[in-house]
Amino acid sequence: MTSSPDITVSVQVHHLPAQSTPQRQLFAYFITIENNTDDSWKLLSRHWTITSGDGQQFTVEGEGVVGEQPLLAPGAQYTYNSFVTVDALPGRMEGHYVMGDAWGQTAQVPIPPFRLDIAPESGERLLN
């Protein structure tokens, strides 16, 4: 794997109280991936570590995101959303994407850690 290319990942998270219970809190998260390089990069896979407020931790890995493996041309953005539940607050998510270029090189692109809470940190989190 090569060093991380100049690909920016931004995250917004929203608590969904109407679909939550005291034992299981539901959150929607919105991810935007921006390719700031001069090359095209394809999102090959994802790796998430999700930690509940009680310390329970689990990992989610798989190909692409939401059933897609988007190809990001130079300057392009890709946005998707998904959902996660945690049993105890506050929770936390973090991880990385594995991206591939046209020459077969792969690179890990970090996903900034974000908090899962009823009153989440305000604003958008950015990571280069």
Swiss-Prot record:
Pfam families cross-referenced by the UniProt entry: DUF525
ApaG domain: residues covered: 1-123
Taxonomy, superkingdom: Bacteria
GO terms under biological process: error-free translesion synthesis
NCBIfam families hit by this protein: PRK05461.1
Protein name as annotated: Protein ApaG
